[in-house]
């Protein structure tokens, strides 16, 4: 899992639920989008090119299962779509070299709450 090596930011966040909680390995902490947000964008910037082949997402289920749809981009190129995240959604795709990985939540019943974001590279 190389997500923790990236600089990470989100276009929406609630106080006390930082985007850094996505990669801290603690199932009790979580990133939470701003109230009434039906979409969100999380951007990871790596210090060098990475050969990425999988992304794992996990919702913070005590708040409910809200994420319905999203996509993953390497820079500006879409590399995967995903639907309901729930406890864990594993998104595998052909390896792609990038310094920037973007997770777009395009549809959520209410504000998204993610406890987990993992990124794996092809060895």
Per-segment meaning from a language model:
Residues 1-52, 60-66, 111, 118-123:
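Disordered, acidic Ser/Thr/Pro-rich linker "stalks" and the adjacent N-terminal cap
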Residues 35-39, 50, 61-123:
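Trp- and acidic/polar-enriched beta-sheet ligand-binding modules for extracellular glycan
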